[in-house]
C-alpha cells in the first residue's frame, strides 16, 4: 500500500514559533522515550514505520515546506509539491497522479490519505491497516476512519453510519462542522468524527482525476494543476461516493493545532533559554532566542519567543492568535533548509532608500548552498565557525572562522561546508526578497 501524508497550513495558530515556511507539524517540541525531540511530522512517519504499515510514504505539500521536509525526514519520504495552495482535493489528485504516472503504481494498489500531524498512538495505524483490508476485500470504494468522539465538538465534521458493525460500518451521511446542539444529537446517532483519513484503490481516484484532466505524464499534470477545482476532498469525493464504509478508532487522538492543545502534551514546562519562578501555575514557556527569558506569577498561560516575535497569552484566549497576526510581515525570521538553518538578526530600511538584511546562517557538514547570483543585492559574509569552500565566479578557496568575503551584485557564488559552518551574511540593496535569486549547476573541484 501507499501512504500519502498531507502537509499544508500557513503556520499562524502557533505563532511565533510557526510561520509560512515552518508550519506546526515541523516544530520539534515533542519528546521521544530516549529524550530526543521530534516534530509532529517526524513522529507520524516513525509511528507508521514502527507499526509496519508501509515504507512507501509520499508527502504532499507546498514548495515553501520542501527544504524543512528534506531536513527533517530526508530519504524516508517522497515529496510532491503543489505549484500553488488550493485545497485537499487537488493536493490528493496531484499525489495520486504522482503514484500512477511517476512511480508507475498499479490501479489496484491501495492508497491511504492522512494528515501528517495527528497526535495519536500505534493503534491508530493498526486501524489504518484494517481500512486497507476493507478496501482489498472490496467492502466499499472509499473507506474512512471514524474517530470515536469524546465530546460534542463544533470543530470537526461527522460521519453518520448505519447499524453498528464489529469491524466496519456502511456510511449513511456526512455532516460538516455542526453547532454544539446538533453535535450532541449526532453523538446519539452513533456518529464519528471525520479524522481526514481515507483509503481507496488508486484506480478509483484516477477515474475522478481524469474527469478534469487527461494526462500521460506527471509533469504535465503538475503544470496544469490550476485546472483542478479548488475544493476539499470531502466535498468532491467522499460526499459524492456511492459506496463508503467507516472503520472506527477509539483511542488517543488529538489535533495539536493550538497552544492550548499543544502545551497539554509537552513534557516540560519550559523549553529553551527560560527560567520559571515558583509562582507560576499551569504555565508553559518556549524560548528560541539566545536572550534569557524569566517568567513568574502567571497562571494558565503560554509564553513563546522566537525571531518572529513574542507571544504572551492566557491559554483560553490563545486560539485568537491566528486573526491577530494576519497583518504581520510575511518574511519568516527563521527557516530550516535542506542544508541547515538561517536566522534573521536585523532588517533595516534607511532614508536613502537602501535596505539591509543581516542573517546568521549555519550549514551542516558536507552540505552546500546552490551556485547562484542576485540582481538587486550585494552581500558580505563573515565566517564565525568552522571551515568550508567558497566559490566566486568559478574560483574556489578555503575559508575558516575569521575570514570575510565580498560578493558584488550579479556575481556567481556558493559555499560548501567541510565542518559545521556558520557565517554572518549582510545583504544590501533594494528590494531584498528571497525571490531575487538565479540558481545554476556547479561541479565542486576542491575537497
Predicted regions and their residues:
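Short coil/turn connectors at secondary-structure junctions
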Residues: 1, 54-55, 75, 107-109, ...
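Short N-terminal binding/cap micro-motifs at the start of the first secondary-structure element
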Residues: 11-16, 23, 434
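Left-handed beta-helix
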Residues: 202-406, 411-417, 431-432, 437-446
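Residue-level signal for inorganic ion chemistry
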Residues: 41, 95, 117, 159, ...
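Conserved N-terminal catalytic core of the sugar/cofactor nucleotidyltransferase
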Residues: 2-5, 15-20, 28-115, 119-125, ...
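C-terminal structural segments of small proteins and small subunits
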Residues: 424-432
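Catalytic metal- and UDP-sugar-binding loop of GT-A-like glycosyltransferases, i.e.
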Residues: 6, 114, 383, 426
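Conserved core of the sugar-phosphate nucleotidyltransferase
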Residues: 121-225, 245
